[in-house]
């Protein structure tokens, strides 16, 4: 960051004509001097050289007043000049030099001159350089005398504008203003273009329809002509293709007819042979599927049932074996547990007996000890002894009774446990019973169902056998009848084919119908109306006429229209009519050959029609004679080769026409025979299907009958087993219930005995207590007490002994009555299970052997059955194959016969059709000559759908009529106006895009402007609060935006709370408080955005020493970042400075000198004394 190294003044204010150099420290420089010495003029000089324009700010009336006015010893200066030297080592100025010198001179007339590093410069150039280094003559970093509170006196808006300036958002406002100007211009341009577009669009809309109509008219004209040519070309191509295909097809038909006739004969022989073989196979099937096959099937069923029964026996035995093995393992495990319990019980009994013996010995010792005491006591009181003996007797009896009571309680517990076990077993068995009963019911139902099904199957088998015999007889009868009908139909179809062919050759049915319609003016077909003079030319004339032979000659076009209407109404097809009043005859050069019209006879009234059909044709003798004239004239040879004018040549075998025959009755007969044959075939096929169905059903029922009998046998066995199991469960439940009753009786007896014992114990206890009282002798009390203690011990030992004996008895009872018997029972059960397992294994083995024998027998029977079935299956397959072959052969024969008939009709029809097509082809080629050759050549693709082309032609002709009259000039006019319209539209789109871009740019500017401002404000606000707290310990202050949401619509308020005082608005503060607040604001800005230097003139004037000290400390700290030049009269401020400059006034001229701190202190002290200014004020 640059800083001021020195200041040079000459003729500036009070500094005289000589050059004065004022050096500054990089950090904190203090300027001191008496009032009026000229120290504040240094601040004015800095403001001046930086380009300041306000004379008032520099404490002058006008700018020329800054020139030295002279003194007693010096004349007035001719100009005032100030040079400021900046250190630029860090290149804060955008000048590549270590020092930047700015010089300004003002003349008496107010003119100013500027220099930059010795080079003349303009003020704006100087300001630009200063701005680049963040220096401004109007900056907040220059606070002249009395200006410190200007920050406080600012309006909220001015303070906010100061933040605007610090944040650098002015550039955003500049950009926005420029963008708004551009936006305004864009909107004006848009408005002008919109007016033009509107006007041009009116013209364009008007011209568009006229232009579209004109273009459509021209396009339709071209398309129409092209479509007509395309239609002709398409029709010609189709006709040529049809003629070629027809000739090829006729040759194929002749060859195919010969093949079919041979094939029909061959098939007839093959059918006869196959029918013979079929009858032989049916006889063998009947024989093979007789009684022997049924007996084998029955035996297989019986053996299969035995196998299933044996398998079931093995399965049951295995299940029982598995169950026995499981029970054996379970019983062995239980025996192991019982043996373990026995050992445990024996061990426990031994242990308890040892403890019992020990207790008996101990009781014995205690009783001996007690007897000694009793003897002593008896010596004291003889009566006491007798009482004591009775007491002891009662105690002994009480102990014995108590022991018995414990024994009975143990018995009751054991009996109850046994009872609970029996109850659990009964519950288990009762839960099992419903399942067994359910299965019994299921198997009963199965048995009944199986018996019913067996009966039903046997009935069905009888019915099927009867039906089968009946169907076989019907098949034989129908087969004989079918053979007879087929022969008759074949003969009739041959007759019909011949008749139909002759009729097709002879004439056109539709023409015949027309002649019988009663419409006047119909003469007949050309074939009927002409006669060949010489038979040698008959073939040539027939070929030359082609399809035109069937053209109908009529009086005029009205007759033709009536005939066409008749054909439509009666759906008789289509015919070509030759109206004599409209048809134009054709002519030919007779020098090439014999004109075709010369070899025929006809009525002169139909001459136009005859010459239309044959007038352009000549007859030549051979192909050699025709060759030189191909493509020049239409020719036909005597043998029937046809040469078209187009160059097309038609030739090959040609069948002449025969006489017509009436075929109505013959056709009816054929149709009747066909229907009968189809009916017989359908019936015969249905009967054969029914027979096969009956055979299959019979076989399936026999198999099912065998299966049902097996299932019945198995179900019956399962039912018997379940009934036995149900009885066993019921018997076990009854036995368990009987045992429970016995146990309950025992429990009741034991409880009764227990109640008696408890009553006896109560009586003995009362007697014992009474005897105790009798024994209470004061003289024997001590002995009695000892005896009582011993009695208590004996009693406790005896009670324990009683419990032990009861426990031993309980253990021995469980051992002898439960464990040992259970052991014997389990051993017996194990022996029984082992025997059962061995027996089951033997049973399984025997059954498996029997099963093996049965399987072998079944395999043998199945082999026999399979051989029979295989033979029958083979025969049936052969029969089926033969039936299918015969059916296919008959179908094939019928197809061939129909095909033969169709081919013969088709051959004759093709002959007639080809002649018609040739005539049509010549007509189309003639029509094509009316169109431009280039147009014809331009059509590369011939349409396929000619009907569609015809509809398009009609549609185009209709549209052309609707468009007339047409303004052709509208095409050119529209193009001119349209270009203008599109240019304007393009221009408008660009203008609209430009407008949107400007609006988007403005929005971005506003957004970024606010973000930059808020970041600046938040940082300065934070700094302000921190610095104010330092300058006024215990106080607080903050900056407040009037409108935080839209900061640019409001100002910036300052709210401060000096230490120990309430929050105050600026207006209510004292001078010192205002100064502190203002300084906090300045230093908050300095901390956020340090300026290169700060110039403060007597900012501490209203502060006490404590506040001055804090301000001075803050300046000292801030001088590490920026240069500070402070004009002051306070020693506290001066004491913190890095450099002190003294200013004095002599003879009206200010002098500058560098001072030490001591010297500066003395000068200040002298100034105070001289001016009566007390320290601290």
From Swiss-Prot:
Major localization listed first in the record, in broad terms: cytoplasm
All residue ranges annotated as the SMC hinge domain in the record: 521-627
An annotated GO BP: DNA replication
Keywords: ATP-binding, Coiled coil, Cytoplasm, DNA-binding, Nucleotide-binding
Keyword Cytoplasm: yes
Location within or outside the cell: Cytoplasm
Signal peptide extent: none
GO cellular component terms attached to this protein's record: chromosome; cytoplasm
Residues binding ATP, per UniProt: 34-41
Annotated coiled-coil segments of the chain: 167-506, 659-1012
MF GO annotations: ATP binding; ATP hydrolysis activity; DNA binding
Record has Coiled coil as a keyword: yes
Family: Belongs to the SMC family.
HAMAP family linked: Smc_prok
PANTHER family for the chain: STRUCTURAL MAINTENANCE OF CHROMOSOMES PROTEIN 3
Function: Required for chromosome condensation and partitioning. Binds single-stranded but not double-stranded DNA.
Record note on quaternary structure: Homodimer.
Comment on protein domains: Contains large globular domains required for ATP hydrolysis at each terminus and a third globular domain forming a flexible SMC hinge near the middle of the molecule. These domains are separated by coiled-coil structures. The N- and C-terminus interact to make up an ATP-binding cassette-type ATPase domain. The SMC hinge domain mediates dimerization and binds DNA.
Protein name: Chromosome partition protein Smc
Species name: Pyrococcus furiosus (strain ATCC 43587 / DSM 3638 / JCM 8422 / Vc1)
């Amino acid at each position: 960051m640059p800083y001021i190294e020195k200041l040079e003044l000459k003729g500036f204010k009070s500094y005289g004509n000589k050059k004065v150099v004022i050096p500054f420290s990089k950090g904190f420089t203090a300027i001191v001097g008496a009032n009026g010495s000229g120290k504040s003029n240094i601040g004015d000089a800095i403001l001046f050289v930086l380009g300041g324009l306000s004379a008032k700010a520099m404490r002058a009336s006008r700018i020329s007043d800054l020139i030295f006015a002279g003194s007693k010893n010096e004349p007035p200066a001719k100009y005032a000049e100030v040079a400021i030297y900046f250190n630029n080592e860090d290149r804060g100025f955008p000048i590549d030099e270590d020092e930047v010198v700015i010089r300004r001179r003002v003349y008496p007339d107010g003119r100013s001159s500027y220099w930059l590093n010795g080079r003349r410069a303009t003020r704006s150039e100087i300001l630009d350089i200063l701005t680049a280094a963040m220096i401004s003559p109007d900056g907040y970093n220059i606070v002249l005398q009395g200006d410190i509170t200007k920050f406080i006196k600012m309006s909220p808006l001015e303070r906010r504008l100061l933040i605007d300036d610090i944040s650098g958002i002015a550039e955003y406002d500049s950009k926005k203003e420029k963008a708004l100007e551009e936006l305004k211009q864009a909107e004006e341009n848009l408005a002008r273009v919109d007016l033009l577009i509107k006007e041009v669009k009116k013209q364009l809309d008007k011209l568009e329809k006229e232009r579209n109509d004109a273009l459509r008219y021209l396009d339709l004209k071209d398309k129409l002509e092209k479509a007509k040519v395309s239609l002709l070309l398409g029709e010609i191509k189709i006709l040529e293709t049809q003629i070629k295909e027809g000739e090829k097809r006729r040759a194929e038909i002749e060859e195919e007819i010969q093949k079919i006739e041979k094939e029909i004969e061959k098939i007839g022989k093959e059918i006869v042979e196959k029918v013979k073989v079929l009858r032989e196979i049916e006889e063998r099937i009947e024989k093979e599927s007789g009684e022997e096959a049924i007996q084998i099937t029955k035996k297989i069923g019986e053996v299969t049932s035995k196998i299933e029964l044996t398998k079931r026996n093995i399965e049951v035995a295995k299940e029982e074996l598995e169950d026995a093995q499981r029970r054996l393992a379970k019983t062995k495990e239980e025996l192991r547990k019982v043996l373990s319990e026995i050992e445990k019980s024996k061990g426990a009994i031994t242990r308890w007996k040892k403890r019992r013996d020990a207790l008996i010995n101990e009781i014995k010792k205690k009783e001996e000890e007690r007897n000694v005491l009793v003897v002593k006591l008896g010596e004291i009181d003889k009566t006491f002894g007798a009482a004591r003996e009775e007491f002891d007797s009662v105690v002994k009896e009480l102990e014995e009774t108590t022991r018995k009571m414990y024994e009975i309680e143990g018995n009751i517990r054991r009996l109850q446990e046994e009872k609970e076990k029996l109850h659990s077993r009964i519950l288990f068995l009762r839960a099992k019973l419903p399942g067994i009963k359910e299965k019994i019911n299921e198997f009963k139902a199965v048995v009944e169902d199986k018996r019913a099904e067996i009966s039903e199957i046997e009935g069905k088998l009888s019915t099927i056998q009867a039906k089968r015999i009946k169907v076989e007889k019907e098949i034989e009868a129908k087969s004989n009848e079918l053979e007879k009908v087929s022969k008759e139909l074949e003969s009739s179809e041959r007759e019909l084919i011949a008749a139909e062919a002759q009729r097709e050759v002879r004439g056109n049915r539709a023409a015949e119908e027309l002649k019988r319609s009663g419409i006047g003016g119909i003469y007949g077909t050309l074939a009927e109306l002409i006669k060949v003079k010489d038979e040698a030319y008959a073939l040539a004339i027939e070929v030359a006429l082609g399809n035109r032979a069937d053209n109908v000659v009529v009086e005029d076009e009205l007759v033709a229209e009536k005939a066409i209407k008749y054909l439509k109404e009666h759906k008789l097809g289509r015919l070509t009519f030759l109206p004599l009043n409209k048809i134009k005859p054709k002519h030919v050069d007779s020098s090439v050959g014999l004109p075709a019209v010369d070899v025929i006879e006809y009525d002169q009234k139909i001459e136009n029609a005859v010459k239309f059909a044959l007038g352009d044709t000549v007859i030549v003798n051979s192909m050699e004679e025709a060759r030189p004239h191909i493509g020049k004239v239409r020719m036909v040879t005597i043998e029937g080769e046809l040469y078209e004018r187009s160059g097309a040549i038609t030739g090959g075998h040609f069948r002449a026409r025969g006489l017509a025959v009436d075929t109505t009755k013959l056709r009816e007969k054929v149709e009747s025979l066909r229907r009968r044959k189809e009916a017989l075939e359908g019936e015969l096929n249905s009967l054969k299907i029914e027979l096969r169905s009956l055979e299959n059903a019979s076989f399936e029922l026999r198999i099912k009958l065998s299966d049902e009998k097996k299932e019945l046998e198995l179900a019956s066995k399962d039912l018997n087993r379940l009934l036995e199991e149900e009885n066993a469960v019921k018997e076990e439940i009854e036995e368990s219930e009987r045992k429970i009753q016995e146990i309950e009786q025992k429990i009741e007896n034991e409880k009764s005995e227990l109640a008696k014992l408890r009553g006896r114990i109560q009586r003995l206890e009362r007697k014992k207590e009474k005897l105790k009282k009798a024994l209470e002798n004061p003289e024997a009390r001590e002995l009695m007490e000892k005896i009582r203690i011993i009695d208590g011990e004996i009693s406790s030992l005896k009670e324990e002994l009683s419990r032990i004996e009861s426990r031993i008895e309980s253990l021995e009872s469980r051992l002898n009555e439960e464990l040992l018997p259970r052991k014997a029972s389990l051993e017996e059960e194990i022996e029984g299970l082992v025997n059962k397992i061995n027996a089951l294994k033997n049973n399984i083995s025997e059954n498996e052997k029997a099963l093996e024998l049965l399987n072998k027998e079944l395999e043998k029977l199945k082999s026999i059955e399979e051989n029979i079935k295989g033979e029958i299956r083979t025969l049936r397959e052969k029969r089926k194959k033969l039936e299918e072959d015969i059916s296919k052969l008959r179908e094939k024969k019928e197809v061939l016969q129909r095909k033969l008939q169709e081919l013969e009709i088709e051959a004759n029809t093709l002959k007639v059709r080809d002649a018609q097509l040739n005539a049509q082809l010549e007509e189309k080629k003639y029509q094509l000559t009316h169109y431009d050759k280039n147009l014809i050549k331009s059509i590369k693709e011939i349409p396929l759908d000619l009907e569609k082309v015809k509809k398009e032609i009609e549609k185009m002709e209709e549209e052309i009529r609707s468009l007339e009259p047409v303004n052709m000039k509208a095409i050119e006019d529209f193009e001119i106006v349209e270009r203008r319209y599109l240019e304007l539209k393009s221009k408008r789109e660009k203008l609209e895009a430009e407008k949107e871009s400007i609006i988007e740019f403005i929005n971005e500017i506003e957004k970024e402007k606010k973000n930059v401002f808020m970041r600046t404000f938040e940082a300065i606000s934070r700094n302000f609060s921190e610095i104010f707290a330092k300058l006024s310990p215990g106080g607080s202050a903050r900056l407040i935006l009037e409108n935080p949401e839209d900061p640019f619509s409001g100002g910036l308020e300052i709210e401060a709370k000096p230490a120990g005082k309430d929050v105050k608005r600026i207006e209510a503060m004292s001078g010192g408080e205002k100064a502190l607040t203002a300084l906090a604001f300045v230093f908050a800005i300095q901390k956020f955005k340090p300026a290169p230097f700060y110039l403060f003139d007597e900012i501490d004037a209203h502060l006490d020493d404590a506040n001055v000290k804090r301000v001075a400390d803050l300046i000292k700290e801030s001088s590490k970042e920026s240069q500070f030049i402070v004009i002051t009269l306070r020693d506290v401020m001066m004491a913190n400075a890095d450099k002190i400059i003294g200013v004095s006034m002599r003879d009206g001229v200010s002098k500058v000198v560098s001072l030490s701190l001591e010297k500066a202190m003395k000068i200040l002290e002298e100034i105070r004394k001289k001016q009566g200014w007390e320290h601290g004020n």
